[in-house]
């Protein structure tokens, strides 16, 4: 598998997680609709599925990991930022095959692609603190 396939999986998963956060629709339905509506060529679909279902299943647990490092209440965090933080925290806590620096770099790129102008700085700061508490340097 190429790194770009995982990057594309993260890209797609961020969009699908955002949709799930907004609608709370069935994750399996979101996955199927996403595969129909989006170009998934070159996407690691197994990784996409793991990220989407993993974040949905462990959402509250993931929030508890990064919420202490937020500068505002979780409810006030932009939904795109929240999707990225949940995805990255899932990778940091549940995917030992991905180095922490890769997780942070990918999250920064997702924030640059999808979120507000300075969101990448916010995401970087929160995840850096998460890594320190997980002792994953």
Swiss-Prot record:
Family annotation (Gene3D superfamilies): NusB-like
One Pfam entry name: NusB
GO cellular component, one term: cytosol
This protein's record includes keyword Cytoplasm: no
Keyword list, A-Z: RNA-binding, Transcription, Transcription antitermination, Transcription regulation
Transcription listed as a keyword: yes
GO MF term set: RNA binding
GO biological process assignments: DNA-templated transcription termination; transcription antitermination
PANTHER family: ANTITERMINATION NUSB DOMAIN-CONTAINING PROTEIN, N UTILIZATION SUBSTANCE PROTEIN B-RELATED
UniProt similarity note: Belongs to the NusB family.
Reported function: Involved in transcription antitermination. Required for transcription of ribosomal RNA (rRNA) genes. Binds specifically to the boxA antiterminator sequence of the ribosomal RNA (rrn) operons.
Protein's UniProt name: Transcription antitermination protein NusB
Taxonomic path: Bacteria, Pseudomonadati, Pseudomonadota, Gammaproteobacteria, Aeromonadales
Gene name per UniProt: nusB
